Each structure stands twice: as structure tokens, then as C-alpha cells.
Amino acid sequence: MSSIWADVLYEGPVPANLSDAELLEVRVRFLAPDDEPGASHPSLDPVNDLRQWRAVIERSDGYDELILWFEHDLFDQLNLIQVLSWIHGRLPSEKTVSLVMIGSFAGHPRFKGLGELRPDEIASLLDRRQRVSELQYQLAEAAWGAFRAPAPDGLDDIRRRDTSALPYLAAAITRFLQEYPWTSDGLSRTERRLLSLARESGISLISAFPRMHDDEQAYYITDGSLASTATDLARSLPPLLTLSQPAGAGADLLRGSIALTETGRAVLAGEQDRVVACGLDRWLGGVHLQSGGTLWRWDDTRQRVIPS
């Protein structure tokens, strides 16, 4: 039996104080807002994907060992802390749960993930699996709880403690916190990168996609994430970029081109603040960022989130 982890947890609401069933429904509504599988992320069938991994794990009497395969990037690390938190206390203690987790592989100088490895290279990783320890479960539960909390300071604190049990977690958390509006201009790191590329007037999203990773230590931005960011920036009031899509683009998320607006150019230059100019209503994990409320921002000089 096998299953995939398909939830882009760094986007949309992941609030605290919900049962697993309630959280599942929140995520399904976010990923398929029109009650159509994959409505916002056409590559996903969230109703199936989000329930399948739970069902596979619950059938523990049908396997001797559960092997988790995860990478070092933000997407995988958030799914890892969720699944470890979910498993802990649900599976019998005698059930073997093992983890294969890598951030590099010989012969792949800019390692992107398991998907680029040949079958024999993937098979070679099996002997490197290690049984999940109690320390790993505890760290995952602490990080998952902090990720879902209504304020991000606890998550900020997690990455400053000893996270060696999950060696890629601290860097992933840091990258997630950089998606908060920055103190310098109100843009997230991803928004700033996309607006920078939009200075090349008329650049296509398909051309922008690989360049979004130029300054990233780990590849995590999906085509759905890029399309969502471009749409948000084009729909803000006033818009920060224009998004032109040909007729019949349909589910092809990256069939379109972008260009900076005057407001986008001013925000990118630091002459205006994105939150002040356009307002904000966004979920990051358990934090609901809204104009008029307590806003948290990423201070790149101090390398932490601060209230503003």
C-alpha cells in the first residue's frame, strides 16, 4: 500500500482547536472551494488525497512496517510534522514506523527531490531508513502545534531550539516565516520574487516558474502556488501586476503572462508598503493576517517575526 502527501500546508488556513475531521474539511474547502476536486489546484484531488494517507496508515494490521519518504523542502517538512503528530498515539507502539529523509544525493548537485532520482537510486535509500524515535515524535508535535497556533512567535521559537532530530525542520520554518509580509515593503519573499520577474514586461508564467527557485535553497514552489500568487497580486486593490491569460487556458495554470503595474513598481522599489496600499487578508498556518488587526511581519535584519 502507498499514499502521497498532497496538501500545500504553507497556503491557506490550518487553524488550531479543531478535530482532525474538522481540519480535513477546512483544507478540502480551501483546496477545492467550488466543491470540485482540484478547483484551486487542478493537479490535486484533495478529497481523495487528504483522506487516503489517513486510511492507509490506519490499516496498520495489513503491514509490518510503515516507511515514510520525505524531502528537505518546506512542502515536505510541514507534511512530515503533520503525519508524525497524527501517527503518534494512533498506531500500536509495537508497529515499526521508519523514515527516509534526505536533502542531497550524490551526482545531483542541485538536488530538487526524490522525483529526480532513478529507481535504483531510490531503492538504495531504503537501507538508510531509521525507525522514528520518540524525540522525533515530540518535536513534530511541538512544531505542528506551533504552526497551527494563532500567533507565530511559538513557531519562531521552535526553530531556535535543538531540532537535530528533524534536521531540515528549522530551515523550512524559517522559509515559511519569510512568507509573512516584510517590514521593508509588506511583500512576502515569494511575492517579491515574482514582482521582480514581472519587471520583464510580458514574461510568461511558464518562463517565470523555474526562475522562482533561483534564490531558494530547496525547491518547494509548485505551479499551483505560483498561479495562486500571481492571481492574488493581480486581484489586489490596487493591483500590483497584470495577469493576461489566453482564452481556453482552463486548468493550465501557467498559460499566461505578467507585467508590473505602477503600484507594483512603487511597492517593489520600497516607495509604498503592500499592506498599506492594498490591505491584507491571508492565512499562514493558524495565523489569520488581516488589515486592521494585529499584523505580524518578517524582520529580515533581526531574522524573526515581530508584531506590528
Where on the chain are the PLM-derived regions?
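C-terminal engagement modules used by replication, chromatin/transcription, nuclear envelope/ESCRT
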Residues: 236-308
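A conserved mid-domain beta-alpha-beta active-site/ligand-binding segment of alpha/beta enzyme cores
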Residues: 119-199
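A structured, charge-rich N-terminal accessory region that forms the first stable segment of a protein
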Residues: 1-43, 48
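A short acidic (Asp/Glu
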Residues: 14-15, 76-84, 108-113
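Short acidic, hydrophobic short linear motifs in intrinsically disordered regions
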Residues: 201-213, 222
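Long, hydrophobic/aromatic-enriched structural stretches that serve as scaffold segments
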Residues: 37-89
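Short, conserved secondary-structure transition motifs
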Residues: 99-124
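Charge-enriched amphipathic alpha-helical scaffolds
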Residues: 213-245
